[in-house]
Amino acid sequence: MSVASQRKLIFRLGGIGFLLDLTEVVEVLDQITDALDPGRSDIGQGIVSALRFRQTWIPVVDPALKLDIFSTVKLRDKTVVVLRGHEGNWALLVDQVDRLSTAENFQPCEMPFLLKVATMGFYSQIQLLHSEPMIVFEPEHYYGSVSKSA
C-alpha cells in the first residue's frame, strides 16, 4: 500500500469536516480568484465555474450546493482541491483545507438510518477523527467518475 493511499486530506464545507483519499488529489490551490471563469458554468452538470489549471480549463464543482450546506466563506477566500478523473482533472471548491492525516487516526462510525435517507446518495460513510464525525467524500457522487491512477 502506497504512502498516499494511507493518508487522508481533511477539508471543510460550512464548518463540516470531510475526508478524501490523498490518491485522488492532484493539487491544492488557494489563490483562485483570477483563474476562475463563471461564464463556463453548467449548473445542470453541477459545474459552477471553470478553473485555469496548467494551461487548460477544468470544471469546478461546489459540493456545498448539492449538500445544501451554507458557507460564509467568500469565493475569493475559498480553496480548490484538484482531483483526478477518467476524463481529466476537475476541481472541488471547499471552504478550507485543514490538514493531512494518516488512515489509522480514523475510526469507523455507523451512519444513523435517518441520515442515510437524508443524504440523497451524496455520501454513505462517516468516520471519526478524535471523536469528530467526518464525512467520507466520494468524488464519483459529485462529478464524473474518478481515476485512481497515481
Predicted regions located by residue number:
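An acidic, low-aromatic, low-complexity terminal/linker signal
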Residues: 1-150
